[in-house]
Amino acid sequence: MIVGHGIDLQEMEAIESARIKHQGFPKKILTEKEFERYQSLSGRRQLEYLAGRWSAKEALTKALGTGIGKIGFHDIEILNTSKGVPYVTKSPFDGNIWLSISHSGNFVQASVILEEKDD
């Protein structure tokens, strides 16, 4: 059964501005494993990755009904399969998490559906 759905839409310009103003911004948002991946990227792809993780973590906390604040960015970890599909490896939710991240122009969007595990 679906127990939560969260969506986040973010302007990548805002993430880029935060990244320029605060050198430590990526480490504030990304877990150690996510940061390793971030460092392996460059240019526009690096910004898309950071903005995508921001948006996905926001969407997940909205699906949980808490928003960022009660749950920190490091309480959630999102990695990718060998085919590039994002998946959640760490979260306070114990069920199935369905995640989609999209980039278009200057926007990134993430959608998260939370589903109870079948017993």
Swiss-Prot record:
Reaction equations catalysed: apo-[ACP] + CoA = holo-[ACP] + adenosine 3',5'-bisphosphate + H(+)
Keywords of this entry: Cytoplasm, Fatty acid biosynthesis, Fatty acid metabolism, Lipid biosynthesis, Lipid metabolism, Magnesium, Metal-binding, Transferase
EC number: 2.7.8.7
List of residues binding Mg(2+): D8, E58
One example GO MF annotation: magnesium ion binding
InterPro entries named among the record's database cross-references: 4-PPantetheinyl_Trfase_dom, 4-PPantetheinyl_Trfase_dom_sf, ACPS, Ppantetheine-prot_Trfase_dom
Cofactor(s) demanded: Mg(2+)
The keyword Glycoprotein is assigned to this record: no
Keyword Nuclease attributed: no
Gene Ontology cellular component annotations, sorted alphabetically: cytoplasm
Cell compartments where the protein resides: Cytoplasm
Main location: cytoplasm
Family matches, as Pfam families: ACPS
GO biological process assignments: fatty acid biosynthetic process
Record's function text: Transfers the 4'-phosphopantetheine moiety from coenzyme A to a Ser of acyl-carrier-protein.
Sequence similarity: Belongs to the P-Pant transferase superfamily. AcpS family.
The name this protein goes by in its record: Holo-[acyl-carrier-protein] synthase
Organism expressing this protein natively: Streptococcus suis (strain 05ZYH33)
Lineage of origin: Bacteria, Bacillati, Bacillota, Bacilli, Lactobacillales
